[in-house]
A protein has these predicted regions:
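Core beta-strand elements of the Rossmann-like FAD/NAD(P) dinucleotide-binding domain
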Residues: 39, 181-190, 256-257
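N-terminal Rossmann-like FAD-binding beta1-loop-alpha1 element of flavoenzymes
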Residues: 41-63, 425
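An anion/pyrophosphate-binding glycine-rich loop and adjacent beta-alpha core
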Residues: 68-70, 75-76, 84-91, 124, ...
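Glycine-rich active-site loop/strand segments that organize a redox cofactor
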Residues: 79-129
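A glycine-rich dinucleotide-binding beta-alpha-beta segment and adjacent secondary-structure elements
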Residues: 159, 326-403
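A conserved short coil-to-beta-strand element within the FAD-binding core of flavoproteins
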Residues: 159-172
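Glycine-rich loop(s) and the adjacent beta-strand/alpha-helix scaffold that form part
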Residues: 190-236
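A conserved FAD-binding loop/helix module that cradles the flavin
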Residues: 199-212, 216, 402-429
């Protein structure tokens, strides 16, 4: 399916798919008896990547997650409607120490492949903005689709269960599975780690993937919060909390032009979240408060027509009045337009269109949408997501040092990386 024109709205027939739950195919352990289980593939994590992999990884697949329900991050994403991919997804929309790593997986399972899957399951969707595709009805439709595919593949899903004590053996891996108060020793030929990163710990994020990697000597790139609001310890923006405007926010020579929101603790909004993934601690960010126009020329033109007009009122036509009022003392915005020479106006506009700020930090993993860093891609096959030095060990999704922009890119990485691993595993069992 070719890309649609940017900015168009796309609609599909509304979905009537009901949410289903994958069956538990393993009988519960009996008290007092040592139990064991053998599977072809064990997937740790029942999020987007884990479920997608389980649905396509061949027979005898076990999925383990400590959550009460599968796909919890899917459920809450996109305001409950799941921004499941982006029409314009490409390798340029991702951050990684190895920027070429994503190309293979994204090319072999594209955004249009996932759209086709969604269409096959009659899930209604539309483009919201900038190529972002959302469910018309509910994110639960995506979860139901993945669970239906898992059921069809015969995958077993164990929720409120934990995996620990991972070991490598000649024939694969073993780990301890704690489920329903009983411990089972699981043997598996393939082990897939799909537990995500550290973002939003209240949803159950633990960083388990990095612990597993360390246990098998797979290197990990240091992690930090991404797609996250900035904080300022001086509370300077508390008086204008709630003020929003279109702006261009820049960090480390990378700029995003979307909405900016002032908060009690600092800055948020899509433009800020995007820039946060490129920001380095201690470095400045730049705010352009009037990116869509030549502010200097417009103020000069206004001065020529109505020089007695108050400068702050004139600025209020281009920047929210509450923000102008907030800046009045800092920038000495007294007087009428006629009182401001070309030089002073030019200096003022340069300031407003390149406002340099030094964040104290970010809101951290508590509110971060993603985790930057993760499993070092140099240790993985870009074609299969398999660890190069640990046969049959796979890392997929957010656990890997691949972070997408805001707007459906991280879900697409989940689908693409999951399919890369699933296909590699499936080929071994055909």
């Amino acid at each position: 399916m070719p890309p649609k024109k940017r900015g168009s709205r796309i609609f599909r027939k509304r979905s009537s798919v009901a949410q289903t739950k994958a069956p538990n195919l393993t009988p519960p352990p009996q008290a007092g008896k040592a139990t064991a289980m053998q599977v072809d593939t064990a997937i740790i994590g029942a999020g987007a990547a884990g479920m997608m992999c389980a649905a396509h990884a061949g027979a005898r697949v076990l999925v383990v997650d400590h959550a009460r329900a599968a796909g919890e991050k899917i459920r809450i994403s996109g305001g409950g409607r799941c921004n499941f991919t982006n029409m314009y997804c490409s390798a340029d929309n991702f951050i990684s120490a190895n920027p070429h790593f994503v190309k293979s997986a994204l090319a072999r399972y594209t955004q249009w492949d996932f759209v086709e899957l969604v269409d096959r399951h009659n899930i209604a969707w539309h483009e919201k903005t900038l190529g972002q595709l959302f469910c018309d009805v509910s994110a639960k439709d995506i979860i139901a689709m993945l669970q239906k595919l898992m059921n069809k593949n015969g995958a077993e899903l164990l929720l409120q269960s934990t995996a620990s004590n991972f070991s490598k053996h000649a024939n694969g891996f073993t780990f301890d599975l704690l489920s329903g108060g009983k411990t089972t020793k699981v043997s598996t030929q393939n082990l897939v780690i799909a537990t995500g990163g550290k973002s939003i710990p209240k949803m159950g994020a633990t960083g388990l993937a990095y612990d597993v990697a360390a246990g098998f000597d797979v290197p990990v790139i240091p992690t930090r919060a991404g797609l996250v609001p900035f904080t300022f310890t001086d509370g300077r923006f508390a008086p204008i909390s709630g003020v929003a405007l279109p702006a261009r926010v820049s960090a480390s020579n990378t700029s995003f032009e979307e909405a900016l929101l002032f908060t009690h603790r600092g800055l948020s909004g899509p433009a800020v979240l995007q820039a946060s993934s490129y920001w380095q601690e201690g470095a400045p960010i730049s705010l352009n408060l009037a990116p869509a126009n030549d502010l200097y020329e417009k103020l000069r033109a206004q001065r020529q027509i109505s020089g007695r007009r108050n400068l702050t009122k004139a600025l209020g036509h281009h920047i929210p009045a509450r923000l102008v009022e907030h800046l009045t003392a800092e920038l000495d915005l007294a007087g009428n337009l006629a009182d401001w020479s070309d030089t002073r106006l030019e200096t003022l506009c340069a300031y407003l269109q390149d406002w340099q700020l030094y964040p104290s930090g970010t809101e951290g993993y508590r509110t971060a949408e993603v985790t930057l860093g993760g499993i070092d891609t140099n240790a993985l096959s870009s074609r299969s997501m398999a660890a190069k030095d640990v046969p049959n060990l796979y890392f997929i999704g957010e656990a890997v040092d691949v972070t997408g922009w805001l707007g459906g890119y991280n879900f697409q990485w989940a689908w693409s990386s999951a399919m890369a691993a699933a296909r590699a595993i499936g080929q071994k069992h055909t």
